Structures are given as structure tokens and as C-alpha cells.
């Protein structure tokens, strides 16, 4: 579940909170807020379990992952699969407290979560699939709040997908050399020596979508100020990954948490006060 390393929970939680506060104009229903926060913890934990299950043979070949519980034999893979099902069932019970549209979206989200760890075997875009899986929480937040998915929600969806590709590519850059040896695919391998350039282009697109979100949701100057901070953070991330060191790549990945947090603060200041 990796609750001792909650960065994955944070990175999934921020877009979910963006969507909840935008959909509710700053005042989300407390019940929905609790449902989605707990749902994020459960689904991210389930995602970690199914990822480690799918990669249990691959992880043995990678220094950073060879001591994970399933790979090392500390936890039997069948027990892990049963635990994954339990987590999914608990998350589904939470979704049952919403509406039918959100339940349907949750089913798609589960399928994407299961698909993601296997995509690295046959496509260079597992990061994009992860982005789709994470962004489903955005659509679910809008549907649970409004019982529909307005066109404006798709801007938040797109921003989440692109942001996920950005930070997960940084994460994949740390494993690139070992992934090449064992035949695992990723956007980091596809981008190769152009990785910083392409990440930079994606960062610009991400920022442009965030500006569009400001327009369609009529956000105030508080949000615009936070976008300046987001821009500075992305410049800093470019500085980090230029060092071509695994530590720097992972630092850049972890530091993206602040981007999610800053955007959330900007949204709250714009619509909730």
C-alpha cells in the first residue's frame, strides 16, 4: 500500500480536490469530500498493490524495487491479489453513496488502474494510461457533485492527464537504464535525449490549460498569482532534471506535489472565500 510513502496519494488527491472545489464553487458537500478523500487513499493503495503484483518478476531485476514485499516473497502474490480485491470492494462501497453516473465512471477507473501496470510491456505510453486513470477522479468529482459532466470538467481532466505524464516521466527517467536492459517501455525511454525538451513543452501546455481553467470558471487574481508560482516551480524542476542523475529525477517527481498543492490553494482562494 506504501502508506509510509504517500506521495502517490497526494498526487492523486490534488486534482480530485481541484475538481470538487470547482464543481461546488468552493463549498463541497462534506460527505462527498470524505468519500473522495477515503476513495483516493483506497484506490491509490489498490493501484500500488496491483502494480507490485504485475511487476513481481520485473522488480527483482531493478535495484530500487527488488525489496518490495511481493517481489521479495514477504507477501505471497495470491494474498496480494486478494487484498487488492478487498481494497476495490471498499472503494466501491464508497462510490455507492454517490450516483449512478459516478458509479459507471468508477468502473472505468478500476479497469484503467488494472490495465496500467501491464501497459509498460507493450507501449511507450504507460504514463499516459496512468494519467487517464488519475484523471477519472476529476470526472467522478464533477459527476458526484452535479450529476453530470460539464464541458468545463474536461479542461481539468486534460490538465490532470498532462501533469501526470510530466511527473511520471521524471519518475521513469530514474529507472531508464535498468528498464532498457529488461525490455520495459516508458515515455522516458521514448523521449530519450529530448526528455527535458518534451517535458518542457508539456509543462507549457499544462500551464495554458490552467489559464483556460481560470477563464471558464471565472477564477480571481488569487488563482493567477498561484499560476506564477506554478511556473517558477516548473522552471525549478527543469533545473533539477538537467543534472542527469537519478536522485535529481526522483526529486523532481516528488517536488510536483507542491504544484498540486499550490493550484489547490489558488482555487480555494478564488472560489471559496
UniProtKB/Swiss-Prot annotation:
Q: Which reaction does it catalyse?
A: all-trans-octaprenyl diphosphate + 4-hydroxybenzoate = 4-hydroxy-3-(all-trans-octaprenyl)benzoate + diphosphate
What does the UniProt keyword field contain? Cell inner membrane, Cell membrane, Magnesium, Membrane, Transferase, Transmembrane, Transmembrane helix, Ubiquinone biosynthesis
The GO cellular component terms are: plasma membrane
CDD domains for this protein:
PT_UbiA_COQ2
Q: Indicate how the chain sits in the lipid bilayer.
A: Multi-pass membrane protein
Q: Does the keyword Thylakoid apply?
A: no
Give TM regions.
7-27, 30-50, 83-103, 122-142, 146-166, 197-217, 221-241, 253-273
The record's annotation in Gene3D superfamilies points to: UbiA prenyltransferase
Pathway in which this enzyme or protein is active: Cofactor biosynthesis; ubiquinone biosynthesis
- Cross-referenced InterPro entries, in alphabetical order? HB_polyprenyltransferase-like, Prenyltransferase, UbiA_prenyltransferase, UbiA_prenylTrfase_CS, UbiA_sf
Q: What is its EC number?
A: 2.5.1.39
Essential cofactor(s): Mg(2+)
Kindly indicate whether the keyword Membrane belongs to this entry.
yes
Q: Where is it localised?
A: Cell inner membrane
Q: Which domain of life is it from?
A: Bacteria
Q: Name one GO molecular function term.
A: 4-hydroxybenzoate polyprenyltransferase activity
Q: Which GO terms describe its biological process?
A: ubiquinone biosynthetic process
Spell out the family assignment given in the record's similarity comment: Belongs to the UbiA prenyltransferase family.
Q: What does this protein do?
A: Catalyzes the prenylation of para-hydroxybenzoate (PHB) with an all-trans polyprenyl group. Mediates the second step in the final reaction sequence of ubiquinone-8 (UQ-8) biosynthesis, which is the condensation of the polyisoprenoid side chain with PHB, generating the first membrane-bound Q intermediate 3-octaprenyl-4-hydroxybenzoate.
- Protein name according to UniProt: 4-hydroxybenzoate octaprenyltransferase
Q: What is the lineage of its organism?
A: Bacteria, Pseudomonadati, Pseudomonadota, Gammaproteobacteria, Candidatus Pseudothioglobaceae
Amino acid at each position: 500500500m506504501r502508506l509510509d510513502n504517500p506521495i502517490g496519494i497526494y498526487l492523486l488527491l490534488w486534482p480530485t480536490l481541484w475538481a470538487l472545489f470547482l464543481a461546488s464553487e468552493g463549498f463541497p458537500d462534506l460527505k462527498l469530500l470524505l468519500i473522495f478523500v477515503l476513495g483516493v487513499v483506497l484506490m491509490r493503495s489498490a493501484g500500488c498493490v496491483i502494480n507490485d503484483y504485475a511487476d513481481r518478476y520485473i522488480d527483482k531485476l531493478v535495484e530500487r524495487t527488488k525489496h518490495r514485499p511481493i517481489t521479495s516473497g514477504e507477501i505471497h502474490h495470491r494474498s496480494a491479489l486478494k487484498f487488492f480485491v478487498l481494497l476495490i470492494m471498499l472503494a466501491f462501497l464508497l462510490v455507492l453513496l454517490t450516483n449512478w453516473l459516478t458509479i459507471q465512471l468508477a468502473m472505468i477507473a478500476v479497469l484503467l488502474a488494472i490495465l496500467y501496470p501491464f501497459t509498460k510491456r507493450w507501449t511507450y505510453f504507460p504514463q499516459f494510461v496512468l494519467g487517464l486513470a488519475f484523471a477519472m477522479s476529476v470526472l467522478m468529482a464533477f459527476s458526484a457533485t452535479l450529476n453530470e459532466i460539464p464541458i468545463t470538467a474536461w479542461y481539468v481532466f486534460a490538465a490532470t492527464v498532462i501533469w501526470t505524464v510530466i511527473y511520471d516521466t521524471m519518475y521513469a527517467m530514474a529507472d531508464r537504464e535498468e528498464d532498457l536492459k529488461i525490455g520495459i517501455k516508458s515515455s522516458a525511454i521514448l523521449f530519450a535525449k529530448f526528455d527535458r525538451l518534451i517535458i518542457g513543452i508539456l509543462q507549457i501546455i499544462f500551464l495554458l490549460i490552467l489559464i483556460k481553467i481560470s477563464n471558464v470558471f471565472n477564477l480571481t487574481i488569487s488563482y493567477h498569482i498561484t499560476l506564477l508560482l506554478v511556473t517558477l516551480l516548473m522552471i525549478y524542476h527543469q533545473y533539477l532534471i538537467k543534472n542527469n542523475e537519478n536522485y535529481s529525477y526522483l526529486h523532481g517527481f516528488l517536488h510536483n506535489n507542491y504544484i498540486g498543492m499550490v493550484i489547490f490553494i489558488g482555487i480555494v482562494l478564488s472560489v471559496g472565500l
